[in-house]
């Protein structure tokens, strides 16, 4: 496994891979890797000749400076995990390599609508940062496929739209959420949880399950369903941030013709902002 930190060396290897006709898969990450990331790697390995994992804590997508400072950086441990998984390349650039002139005045990529709705409304600039760094990685690495987790449901939808709108010839693969045995979605931010909070954390998944049961049963009183869910989370020790029930295909409000719904949930537990989602097939 080769660790690459500079753009010239990355470009040199990408040119060689292209000359050899290799099928390249990209797994973009911010590091602090867990089993969910390893599932992305496994999916990439199954679909390509060469797997490149990027590890870059992208300052452009953090809406809170303290969150950027606190974000876990575990490059050595991450590389050890990826080496055991027989990943071919790790691209781990410094911030100065990606943004040599700083963020002020940096050209960015913005996906209208999806960037500012739902999660984007509560985290201004976040999705603009995501689409910009992903676009830069696509331009640098020129992958045939790229793997993203379905845990970040809106992010995946945004990237799919960006790829379509910008005419990238890249297959976007969504990989299902990996959960702990108690249902908690794996996330790098779970590291912020205390031992006591970790016991409470699966409550977010349990609340989503109860919402799903109501939707499957035909209940469409969405405001009431959401209010009950938020109250339940707050009683469990969470601070409910945002719960939405949307059309899974458009992320717009549900209509009578919607075939699938997605429950999008975000809640604070101590210093950790947990997000999760669940899709539901609706009775027609």
UniProtKB/Swiss-Prot annotation:
Record keywords: ATP-binding, Cytoplasm, Ligase, Nucleotide-binding, Pantothenate biosynthesis
Superkingdom, taxonomy of origin: Bacteria
Positions contributing to beta-alanine binding: 61
Catalysed reactions listed for this entry: (R)-pantoate + beta-alanine + ATP = (R)-pantothenate + AMP + diphosphate + H(+)
Gene Ontology biological process: pantothenate biosynthetic process
Described purpose of this protein according to its UniProt entry: Catalyzes the condensation of pantoate with beta-alanine in an ATP-dependent reaction via a pantoyl-adenylate intermediate.
Entry-linked HAMAP family: PanC
Name of the protein in its database record: Pantothenate synthetase
The organism of origin for this protein: Salmonella newport (strain SL254)
Gene name of the record: panC
